[in-house]
Every structure is written in C-alpha cells, then in structure tokens.
From Swiss-Prot:
It comes from Corynebacterium glutamicum (strain ATCC 13032 / DSM 20300 / JCM 1318 / BCRC 11384 / CCUG 27702 / LMG 3730 / NBRC 12168 / NCIMB 10025 / NRRL B-2784 / 534). One of its GO terms (biological process) is cellular detoxification of fluoride. Na(+) binds at G63, S66. It is found in: Cell membrane. It is a multi-pass membrane protein. GO terms for molecular function: fluoride channel activity; metal ion binding. Fluoride-specific ion channel. Important for reducing fluoride concentration in the cell, thus reducing its toxicity. It catalyses: fluoride(in) = fluoride(out). This is Fluoride-specific ion channel FluC 2. The chain crosses the membrane at residues 1-21, 39-59, 84-104. InterPro entries: FluC. GO terms for cellular component: plasma membrane. Keywords: Cell membrane, Ion channel, Ion transport, Membrane, Metal-binding, Sodium, Transmembrane, Transmembrane helix, Transport.
Length: 108
C-alpha cells in the first residue's frame, strides 16, 4: 500500500517537474522545482500528517518534484567549464532559496 501512495505522489510531482521544464529554460526550471519542493515539503511537515499521507506528499510528490540529480549535472557542467563564480552563485542561490522555502512552508 505504501508503494502505491509513493507512486501516486511521484506521478503528480514528476508531472509538475516536467511542466516547469516546459515553462522555464534550463537552470530556471531546476531552481523553481527544487524551491517549490522545499516549500511544499516544509508545509507538509508542519501538518503532522498520518504516515501514508507523508509518504504520498513528501516522499512521493516532493521527491519527484525536486531534482537534485539535475542540479548536480548542471553544477558539474559549470565546474568542467571552469565557471567558478557562476557555479558558486547557482549553488548558493539554490540552497538559500531552498532553506528559506522550507522555513516559509513550515510557517504557512
């Protein structure tokens, strides 16, 4: 049963992730997806939900929406191109927005 909840949440999170990639070019989609996943995750954590809903919303939806592997690929490309400052800026912005979004989400 848990698998079905995770899969259902993952379907919707993955669809939203794909939709963001259609709306925003490149790194903007990754930044938007990760920030939105952090905001939603912070909000869902604050609700003290039953375990199955936590699996559905946090592990499934937020897990599929966030895209840390794409972030690693994008940071790796900047690193290989020796674009140190853009890499550090992108990494800093991602973590700053992510942590801020979790903080905000927990207070909504």
């Amino acid at each position: 049963m848990i698998f079905l909840y995770a899969a259902l949440g993952g379907f919707f999170g993955g669809f939203l992730r794909w939709s963001l990639a259609q709306l925003f070019p490149g790194k903007r989609a990754t930044l938007a997806a990760n920030t939105l996943a952090c905001l939603a995750g912070g909000f869902f954590v604050s609700l003290d939900l039953p375990h199955l809903y936590t699996v559905l919303l946090i592990a499934g939806f937020c897990g599929a929406l966030s895209t840390w592997s794409t972030l690693a690929k994008e940071l790796g490309q900047l690193l290989n191109e020796k674009k140190w400052w853009p890499m550090l800026g992108y990494l800093s912005l991602t973590f700053t927005l992510g942590y801020s979004a979790v903080f905000l989400g927990m207070r909504l």
